């Protein structure tokens, strides 16, 4: 009987150690800090995380450009940083790229 109790306790400890603490979880953009948005996680279904705005060369979604977005964002990427545009490249993907129309040369 005593051996069964020890096994039960060991099983409880083993299952309790397989957990993770997730920081930066959010529901909407207003819960995130400056320079971030609340985007869907690629790794955990149903989880949204405060994610940095897109930097030059990073993938983006052309329909995801408003900050703060008042509802739940449906994309895993944030809009591009303010000085960048979400542009389509020859390979068909969208990436953050400098807005050359507004550049000061």
Swiss-Prot record:
SUPFAM superfamilies assigned: Colipase-like (SSF57190)
UniProt signal peptide: 1-19
Keywords of this entry: Angiogenesis, Disulfide bond, Growth factor, Mitogen, Secreted, Signal
Compartments in which it is found: Secreted
Tissue expression summary: Highly expressed in liver and ovary and weakly expressed in testis and placenta. Expressed in mucosa and mesenchyme of embryonic gut during enteric nervous system development (at protein level). Predominantly expressed in kidney and liver. Also expressed in lung, ovary, placenta and testis. In fetal liver, is restricted to and highly expressed in hepatocytes. In adult kidney, expression is restricted to the endothelial tubule cells. In placenta, expressed throughout gestation.
Single GO BP term: circadian rhythm
Protein name: Prokineticin-1
Taxonomic source organism: Mus musculus
Designated gene of the protein: Prok1
């Amino acid at each position: 009987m005593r051996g069964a109790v020890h096994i039960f306790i060991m099983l409880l400890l083993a299952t309790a150690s397989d957990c993770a603490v997730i920081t930066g979880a959010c529901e909407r953009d207003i819960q995130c800090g400056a320079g971030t948005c609340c985007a869907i996680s690629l790794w955990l279904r149903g989880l949204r995380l405060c994610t940095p705005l897109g930097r030059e060369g990073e993938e983006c979604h052309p329909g995801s450009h408003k900050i703060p977005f008042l509802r739940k964002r449906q994309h895993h990427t944030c809009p591009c940083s303010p000085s960048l545009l979400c542009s389509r490249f020859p390979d068909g993907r969208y990436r953050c790229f400098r807005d050359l129309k507004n550049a000061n040369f």
